[in-house]
UniProtKB/Swiss-Prot annotation:
Name the record gives this protein: Anthranilate phosphoribosyltransferase
Chain's gene name: trpD
Role, per record: Catalyzes the transfer of the phosphoribosyl group of 5-phosphorylribose-1-pyrophosphate (PRPP) to anthranilate to yield N-(5'-phosphoribosyl)-anthranilate (PRA).
GO biological process: L-tryptophan biosynthetic process
Residues holding Mg(2+) 1: S92, E224
InterPro entries, per database record: Anthranilate_Pribosyl_Tfrase, Glycosyl_Trfase_fam3, Glycosyl_Trfase_fam3_N_dom, Glycosyl_Trfase_fam3_N_dom_sf, Nuc_phospho_transferase
Binding-site residues, Mg(2+) 2: D223, E224
Cofactor(s) required, per the database record: Mg(2+)
Domain of life where this protein originates: Archaea
GO molecular function: anthranilate phosphoribosyltransferase activity; magnesium ion binding
Membership in a protein family: Belongs to the anthranilate phosphoribosyltransferase family.
Amino-acid biosynthesis keyword on record: yes
Binding annotation for anthranilate 1: G80, N110
GO cellular component, one term: cytosol
Length: 336
């Protein structure tokens, strides 16, 4: 099947849903040779992947993943694409703990691909054991309100594509598929993307995948809601998608410079997150976490608007709730 699909894609013709599903099934089941995987990924990148193709790929990846179904009323993920190459600290990981004081979070993530520190790297540096059984992850979401879904544990079929991705060294559709394939089936999502042009497209994919609410965001070169300039947001709510731009000043947050929110390696980023949660860092780094958490609480229908979300996010940090969630997760996974 992959050969027929390749013939089509190199002529810049789009795959229909069934064809795209068959391609991903071939890759995930080990039926596609590495050269074929490299060829189809490169051809798709040159053609430009459609909403229908990305949706089909994500559905099959979800089928091949190991899944958990935490017994919680709502579930949020803050997983983004990464790959913005700006070397900020792990904002979406810090955001996950702040938000988990109010909404259960299934944080999907991995080790760094292009940055110095992925979410898994910084969590390890903070003392979180990544090698826990997946059932333990389900329990931590139910009992603590947060769990970390380490991608390699939940997506074993990715072993066929990962070496090819590394050797290719270019962005492919897999860069966006990670955040679209939460193994706990989170029904709300704050998803940062590395390119502003992707926000509407991926909001449509999340709609096709059945999410209740999602914000797909890109902020002035960052795969986060930014405080250094404008952020483009595509919002999925009640089956409708609308796009708009925001700036930090709209919400009374001071504009920052990129150097104010830069991170370093995993150890340095863990130190920054600790300082935010312990109340030692009260400047730009805290501000950007608060703003992202506020939008996450808004889209998860926990805050009626972003302003209320900001108050809740500040309370989570100031009252030590975010720090407690981190400490509880470290302890819970240590036993695992």
């Amino acid at each position: 099947m992959i050969t027929e699909a390749l013939k089509k894609v190199i002529e810049f013709k789009d795959l229909d849903e069934k064809e795209a599903e068959a391609v991903m099934k071939d890759i995930m089941s080990g039926n596609a040779k590495p050269t074929q995987i490299a060829a189809i990924l490169t051809a798709l990148r040159m053609k430009g992947e459609t909403i229908e193709e990305i949706t089909a790929f994500a559905k099959i990846m979800r089928e091949f993943s190991l899944k958990i179904n935490p017994n919680v009323p709502k579930l949020l993920d803050t997983c983004g694409t990464g790959g913005d190459n700006l070397n900020t600290f792990n904002i979406s990981t810090a955001t996950a703990f702040v938000v988990s004081a109010y909404v259960p979070v299934a944080k999907h993530g991995n080790k760094a691909v292009s940055s110095k520190s992925g979410s898994a790297d910084v969590l390890e540096a903070l003392g979180v054991n990544l090698n826990v059984p997946i059932e333990r992850v389900k329990e931590s979401i139910e009992k603590i309100g947060i769990g970390f879904l380490f991608a390699p544990h939940f997506h074993p079929a990715m072993k066929f594509a990962t070496p090819v991705r590394k050797e290719l060294g270019i962005r492919t559709v897999f860069n966006v598929l990670g955040p679209l394939t939460n193994p706990a089936n989170a029904n709300y999502q704050l998803m940062g993307v590395y390119d502003e042009k992707l926000t509407e497209k991926l909001a449509n994919v999340l709609k096709n995948l059945g999410l209740k609410g999602a914000l797909v965001v890109h902020g002035s070169g960052m795969d986060e809601i930014t405080t250094i300039g404008k952020t483009k947001i595509s919002e999925l709510r009640n089956g409708e998608i609308k796009s708009y731009y925001i700036e930090p000043e709209d919400f009374g947050i001071k504009k920052a410079k990129l150097e104010d929110i830069r991170g370093g390696d995993a150890e340095e980023n863990a130190k920054i997150i600790g300082e935010i949660f312990e109340g030692e860092e009260v400047g730009a780094k805290r501000d950007i976490v608060v703003l992202n958490a506020a939008f996450a609480l808004y889209i998860a229908e926990e805050a009626k608007d972003v302003e209320e979300g900001i108050k809740l996010a500040e309370k989570s940090i100031d009252e030590g709730k975010a720090l407690k969630k981190l400490e509880d997760l470290i302890e819970f996974y240590r036993e695992g």
